[in-house]
Amino acid sequence: MNVLSLFDGMGCGAIALRELGINVDKYYASEIDKFAIMQTKHNFPGIIHLGSVLDVDVSKLDRIDLLIGGSPCQRFSFAGKRTGMTTTENEEIYTLDRYLQLKSEGFQFEGQSYLFWEYMRILTDIRKYNPNVKFLLENVEMGDKWERVLSEAIDLILSST
């Protein structure tokens, strides 16, 4: 099984898979925190580090069987502002297509919660090569509006095959 872990942190996905006894052929990790990467390299020297989620190109990877990750959640969280995914111009982003359009036009985004759309972009791309890819998206309890947005985005991906 080939795994792609987005927002990998210190390799908790690799730890969980190991503890479950799941054999992993290749484990790709996208993470930008240098201390988390150092710890992961120490614990799992075989992990292939890809850098920022913004730079992940699945066409350059072996077929991915499992995508895991939890995008930053500060702007969804009850402990945060709960303002969700917005541009610096305060436009709320409700679809992957709109996110990709804004990104291509050079818009800037508030906080890091918009990176959910990068998870969805990558999942969409993986499904071109492996429509049966399994995925796990972990996130926080959030307000109803943003929970609907995330759920609808996932449903659209699943129903597009």
Features from the language model and the residues they span:
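Conserved active-site and SAM-binding loop architecture
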Residues: M1-T161
